[in-house]
Amino acid sequence: GLDKSYILEYNFGAGEGLSLFIPNAKGGAGGPIGNDEKAMGYVEDYNYSEQIAQSNHYWGGQLFSGGAIYLGAVAFFLFFVALFLTKDAIRFPVFVLAVLCMLLAAKTGSLNHWFIDHFPMYNKFRDSKMILVVLQVLVPMMAILFLDKLWKEESLQGDKKFHYGVIGGTVLIALILFAFPSVSGSFITAEEVKQFGEYAKQKPEQLGMIDGLKTELIHVREAIYKADAGRTLFFAFAAAILLLLAMNKVNRYLWLGLMGLFVVLDQVNVDLRYLNSDPIEEGSEVLEK
């Protein structure tokens, strides 16, 4: 089979699972920060502008990233709430499967190594993070199941206080992720830490400048993270309000229509980061292929 380090090159690093509902939790797609005009606007010390512009927009654990595997802030919010509030027994195997998918998508951990060593054909996969395809089915499935329960006004797990507690607690988690960026992990990769250390050894007289660059890079990446964490908080809060309306028997066409609108706005807004309206010109590289 393939070498373990080779198999896990594109698996999630620490905290990268947050990118499932915070697209830029680890910077999104790889590439120079200078290509992102908004990100460059976060630079405070312009003495480091050139170096920041050349730094990688992505700081996760994968060898390279073409963009986050984004499931949606609204969809993930509904999924999380559904695990607590639906009475269906299916929520238990769904929860176990979701946790298993996250563990197998991670770069570290003994579970992945056990699967590589013992599970038939598992060591033939180049990117075991593909297991997240299962999560891409589970999240919308549970979200739709939960909305169906609300639409039909079926009973939910627990009383109203429990319902409000789960919804409020989920929004609180989004608030904590926004207010405390360090919860997501480091904003400097292990390779960058190594590079900064080597620069400091080679040019000790420039230690102040090196530390300043490192601090500025962390600041810019924190700002990139917070922009999307704030976005997720907004959608979580909006979804929470709509759930409260649904639970209080407000016109179901209204809350369901608005929920659908927020899902579309949430997804399309992120999709457009990787698409543009530029026409494909005749004779371009894409057409030639």
Language model features with spans:
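Periplasmic/ER-lumenal interhelical loops and adjacent helix-loop junctions
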Residues: 1-82, 180-232
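Contiguous transmembrane helix-bundle modules in multi-pass membrane proteins
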Residues: 86-288
